């Protein structure tokens, strides 16, 4: 039925159907990270997926067990499928070794660097890179283009009917349009003797293709998820009392689960968070739920958060995720870092949706972080050089959207895990709020040394206070350092985040 934003009907849609759970405190601190861990892999129905324990020792095993993969589609219609069996498989060195397109470019480069195969390879390269017809015709004699054979019989067998050996295309048609687009800015008029120019084009194509992969929105999302989780797993002192689990679910799957059932107590999320852990006590109760998603103040997202918060409250564990800057009236914090540009929604539908969410009691179990934080440096000679080829991930000094930004929920989880490891359940008044040792990108811009903020933007006190007033959990960068600070553990209602502590 249609939702009237003025009569509070949004909240009334989400009920447990009469079921309630009483939370019993246990000495364990269990974290559940829900996210799209398997990417584009085929998987069982969400209702059949278990929560899986993960730690430093089995981290790569879990990546493989989930058959983690991603299908990257490009504007020219080409596609690349990447499969991951470990965190290292996200590294450009491994991608370079495993992706067939790079093998074809490696082969072409090797043949261009050999005097025995240069002429045929040059002809092939010019076709691939779309040089003019007159530049494609070999300038040297036919004999120079013939493949070199160990003996006369081999030479004869290698010739096509009619005599001279013709260059054989070795690169697939799939790579053709993609590579020609990548190298177009680097094209120069060449002949067969300009070996270095052709090799440079191959290198430009190789780097361009790698950038397209690393910066593809789907690859970035999957890498940011796993590196954010690894940040948490690597730093948390897991033990019999402190454990981390993952539940594989895309944002759409989570939303569908929550809205498809007649009551929230019939959902998969309720089963995992409440029924198994609280009502039947088959599992220890959860202490913290992470949602590796980005939410905006739109109807579908607010409806999902309302349902999640009710289940989280019943489980006695807060749900922490990320709120997009749209809630502040801007699309990007980086492009609008001045807090005076952040506006409230006024009397708009967005404001009514947000008010409905904030107004429900269970939202005290809902914490939304902003901004994101960095989980790896850009690749390059001055930061993280590759072993396989010379590669600069950024073509300019700094490309904000192409950094790897992970969900702030992982930072919050690490701080809470640290607090529990140090103080146990007596941590309430001694919660960790700082993280250091983050990747710090230092670069030159207009002759000046620049330190990239580890949490997207340099945050001022005014900015922090404005985010707190909006009910968010700000992650603030310490200027010129590898540290960030969580301003406050608060719910979107402005009250303290409701947790077992």
Name every feature range the model reports, one short phrase each:
Residues 2-94:
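Compact, well-ordered interaction domains used in eukaryotic information-processing assemblies
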Residues 69-195, 202-206:
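Long, charged, helix-rich clamp/arm modules that form nucleic acid-engaging surfaces
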Residues 106-109, 176, 203-211, 223-230, ...:
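Short, well-ordered alpha-helical packing segments
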Residues 119-126, 217-224, 329-330:
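Short, glycine/acidic-rich hinge or "gate" loops at secondary-structure transitions
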Residues 137-194, 214, 234-237, 248-249, ...:
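A glycine- and small-residue-enriched flexible loop/hinge signal that marks low-structured segments
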Residues 187, 196-259:
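Extended assembly-interface regions of large multimeric machines
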Residues 223-226, 260-275, 300-311:
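Well-ordered, non-membrane alpha-helical segments in soluble/globular domains
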Residues 244-280:
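A short, well-structured beta->alpha microelement
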């Amino acid at each position: 039925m249609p939702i009237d934003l003025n009569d509070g009907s949004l909240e009334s849609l989400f009920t447990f159907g009469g079921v309630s759970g009483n939370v019993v405190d246990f000495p364990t601190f269990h974290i559940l990270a829900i996210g799209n861990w398997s990417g584009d892999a085929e998987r069982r129905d969400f209702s059949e997926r278990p929560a899986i324990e993960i730690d430093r020792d089995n981290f790569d095993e879990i990546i493989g067990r989930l058959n983690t993969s991603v299908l990257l589609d490009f504007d020219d219609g080409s596609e690349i499928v990447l499969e991951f069996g470990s965190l290292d498989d996200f590294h450009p060195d491994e991608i370079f070794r495993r992706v067939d397109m790079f093998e074809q470019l490696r082969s072409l480069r090797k043949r261009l660097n050999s005097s025995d195969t240069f002429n045929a390879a040059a002809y092939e390269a010019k076709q691939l890179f779309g040089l003019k017809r007159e530049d494609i015709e070999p300038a040297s004699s036919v004999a120079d283009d013939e493949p070199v054979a160990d003996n006369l019989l081999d030479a004869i067998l290698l010739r096509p009917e009619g005599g001279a050996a013709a260059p054989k295309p070795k690169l697939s048609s799939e790579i053709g349009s993609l590579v020609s687009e990548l190298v177009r800015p680097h094209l120069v008029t060449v002949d067969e003797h300009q070996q270095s120019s052709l090799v440079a084009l191959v290198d430009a194509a190789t780097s361009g293709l790698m950038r397209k992969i690393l910066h593809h929105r789907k690859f970035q999302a999957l890498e940011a998820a796993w590196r954010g989780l690894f940040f948490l797993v690597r730093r948390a002192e897991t033990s019999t009392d402190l454990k981390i689990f993952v539940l594989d679910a895309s944002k759409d799957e989570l939303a569908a689960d929550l809205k498809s059932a007649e009551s929230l107590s019939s959902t998969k999320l309720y089963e995992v968070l409440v029924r198994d852990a609280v009502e039947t006590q088959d599992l220890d109760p959860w202490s913290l739920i992470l949602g590796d998603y980005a939410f905006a103040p739109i109807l579908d997202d607010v409806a999902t958060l309302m349902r999640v918060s009710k289940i989280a409250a019943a489980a006695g564990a807060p749900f922490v995720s990320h709120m997009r800057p749209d809630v502040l009236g801007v699309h990007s914090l980086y492009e609008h870092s001045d807090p005076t540009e952040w506006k409230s929604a006024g009397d708009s539908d967005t404001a009514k949706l947000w008010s409905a969410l904030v107004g429900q009691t269970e939202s005290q179990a809902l914490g939304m972080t902003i901004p994101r934080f960095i989980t790896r440096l850009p690749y390059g000679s001055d930061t993280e050089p590759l072993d396989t080829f010379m590669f600069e991930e950024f073509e300019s000094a700094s490309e904000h959207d192409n950094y790897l930004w992970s969900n702030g929920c992982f930072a919050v989880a690490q701080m809470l895990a640290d607090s529990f490891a140090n103080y146990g359940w007596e941590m309430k008044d001694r919660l960790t709020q700082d993280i250091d040792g983050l990747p710090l990108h230092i670069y030159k811009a207009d002759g000046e040394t620049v330190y990239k903020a580890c949490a997207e933007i340099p945050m001022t006190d005014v900015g922090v206070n404005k985010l707190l007033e909006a009910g968010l959990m700000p992650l603030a960068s310490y200027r010129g350092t590898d540290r960030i600070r969580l301003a406050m553990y608060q719910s979107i209602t402005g009250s303290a985040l409701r947790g077992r502590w």
